């Protein structure tokens, strides 16, 4: 129902208001509609909407209220704000360090503090990780999502760590200062989709001056103080030339969340369509940033979010070694490796697939993998995913049929040929166009038959299976003809992980 306006007789000074409301609505549509949508500006935190007509009179303002947001999609792109480049770099590094440190602390304290009651409570909330709990405390144990969505694994670690230091379970826990400092770590859980400089996340002020201690690396001091904010981290990094040479971009989803949070509820309720163009590598676990949109979709049932992920410029780019040095050496040798591409794409799939279980309303969210105008070449890469999904299924069938020795729960999930628990099923749904909200704008490859793999490998040992899985054909891909070479396409946009390497496949 359009907003009511004063009778036309009171607006005789304007020819516009002598027209019927239906004709005025047509004029408003032509005046406000933009086929390309309203492109968000991070610098201004605004949209390019011409509101001149709303200032002519109250009647026009009333009839036009919120119409631009209802008529147009709002478009957000992966953004590199030069003004906060150091903030973005530090936030990304701090977040990566934080989650690594939390797991280390959990692994260190579990033998002393993990009770049966805590194990039971964790197993109820995170049953998929119930078999992880008895192994906590193993020397040398490293963080591994064990086939579950990475964000779920981080939630599990945070939840369990909180229980370890909960006075409900350990009422007499206290004591020395270092123990209190360790306990404070459990409270820190910043949202990955928070944008640097957002109030309450990272402080404003001179770049590089965040109050971090200049002594030692974070991972070397489990007793580091983590009070209220992420800026209390201890020496997350040395701020070196990499800040200036690499573009640590913000995801389109993070930009959208920033904008939506800045709107009043009365304004936000007019937004109907959001398009997220994820066309570059970005910071802070971008594949899980859809979680930050759940509350808005629940609050506004008419809101529809379409997340478009560029495969060649965003999802595909991973590497297994440090090939990108600051001086450019070795970069020309880099290619898209077949050994890591399945895990890279599957991570986006599994993170999106759990959104409904976290509260995303049905029909509110859609994820599209885009081929960047190279459908044939992208299909060839997806044939690797099809092959790896079939291998994961073939191995599971071989275990069940006693063709291969039955592995332990951990052994199965740590093997090279294992991607994610739900990966084969998700890829099959996407290939058959059966998934309700994950799609491709190209043909997603040819399905492989796991039974054929079992027949071909019958009689092989587990070691021979492992060697055969590593023998991908082709082993690597160069970019399609319509794009720059792989190392040029990635140059300047590589998101480096906490250990100094380029974004890793896991």
Language model regions located:
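Short, surface-exposed structural microsegments at secondary-structure boundaries
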Residues: 1-273, 278-301, 322-329, 355-356, ...
């Amino acid at each position: 129902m359009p907003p009511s306006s004063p009778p036309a007789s009171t607006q005789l000074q304007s020819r516009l208001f002598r027209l019927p409301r239906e004709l005025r609505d047509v004029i408003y549509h032509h005046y406000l509609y933009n086929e390309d949508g309203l492109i968000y500006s991070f610098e201004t935190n605004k949209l390019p909407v011409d509101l001149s007509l709303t200032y002519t009179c109250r009647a026009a303002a009333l009839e036009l209220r919120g119409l631009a947001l209802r008529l147009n999609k709002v478009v957000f792109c992966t953004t590199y704000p030069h003004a906060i480049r150091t903030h973005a770099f530090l936030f990304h590094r701090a977040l990566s360090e934080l989650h690594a440190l939390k797991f280390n602390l959990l692994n260190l304290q579990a033998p002393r503090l993990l009770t049966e009651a805590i194990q039971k409570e964790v197993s109820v909330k995170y049953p998929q990780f119930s078999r992880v709990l008895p192994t906590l405390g193993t020397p040398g144990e490293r963080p591994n999502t064990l086939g579950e969505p990475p964000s779920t694994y981080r939630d599990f670690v945070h939840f369990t760590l909180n229980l370890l230091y909960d006075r409900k379970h350990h009422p007499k826990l206290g004591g020395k200062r270092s123990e209190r400092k360790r306990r404070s770590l459990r409270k820190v859980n910043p949202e990955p989709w928070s944008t640097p400089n957002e109030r309450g996340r990272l402080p404003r002020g001179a770049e590089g001056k965040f109050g971090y201690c200049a002594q030692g690396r974070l991972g070397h001091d489990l007793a580091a103080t983590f009070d209220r904010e992420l800026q209390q981290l201890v020496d997350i990094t040395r701020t070196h030339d990499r800040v200036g040479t690499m573009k640590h971009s913000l995801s389109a989803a993070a930009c959208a969340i920033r904008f939506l949070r800045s709107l009043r509820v009365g304004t936000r309720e007019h937004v109907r369509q959001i398009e997220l163009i994820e066309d570059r590598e970005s910071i802070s676990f971008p594949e899980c940033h859809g979680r930050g949109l759940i509350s808005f979709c629940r609050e506004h049932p008419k809101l529809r979010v379409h997340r478009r992920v560029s495969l060649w410029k965003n999802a595909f780019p991973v590497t297994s070694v440090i090939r990108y040095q600051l001086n450019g050496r070795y970069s020309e040798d880099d290619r898209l490796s077949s050994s890591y591409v399945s895990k890279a794409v599957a991570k986006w799939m599994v993170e999106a697939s759990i959104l409904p279980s976290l509260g995303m309303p049905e029909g509110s969210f859609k994820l599209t993998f885009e081929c960047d105008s190279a459908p044939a070449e992208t299909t060839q890469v997806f044939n690797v995913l099809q092959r790896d999904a079939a291998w994961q299924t073939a191995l599971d069938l071989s275990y069940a049929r006693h063709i291969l020795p039955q592995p332990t729960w951990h052994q199965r999930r740590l093997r090279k040929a294992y991607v994610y628990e739900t990966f084969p099923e998700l890829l099959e749904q996407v290939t058959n166009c059966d998934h309700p909200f994950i799609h491709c704008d190209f043909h997603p490859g040819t399905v492989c038959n796991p039974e054929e793999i079992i027949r071909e490998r019958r009689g092989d040992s587990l070691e021979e299976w492992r060697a055969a899985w590593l023998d991908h054909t082709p082993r690597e891909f160069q970019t399609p003809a319509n794009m720059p070479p792989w190392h040029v396409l990635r140059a300047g946009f590589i998101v480096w992980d906490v250990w100094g390497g380029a974004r890793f496949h896991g």
